[in-house]
Amino acid sequence: VIGTEPALKPAVEKYPGGRILVMATPMTIKQEKFQALKHQFDDRAQIIGLPCEGLMEFVERGELRGSAVAAYLTEKLAPYLREPVDGIVLGCTHYPFLTGAIRRIVGPGPEIMDGSHGVAMQLERKLAQSGMLRQCGEPGTAVFENSLDEPEILAR
């Protein structure tokens, strides 16, 4: 099992002393694990946790753009954009699907970061350690599983 965590470390390393907004589910923001991670970097940057109740559901419904998601993001982000933001960390595995919608709201300024690169690197290390990392140059196969019962949403 490979756990995910918000990409706070890379954000703080890239923007020391910067203002970093972490968009995550309310549960993630409240969790002791997140609070400990935030505390680890509190002295190196201004880290602001933004609980985004309901944002994950936009992704699950396949609503990645449009007026409803734009209104939601504007309402959530506008109060934090009154001052410059250096980085926005996407603290939920669903949120990278909304990168384009978030970019349209925040403009070109803040860098939008997620933890997918770190997860991929950890997966590669674990597969190599267990001798399961594919070494040949031939293409492999991928199997995607989803409990969603709506093929038209999955097709997007």
Regions found by a protein language model. Give the residues of each.
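Non-catalytic structural scaffold of enzyme domains
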Residues: V1-R156
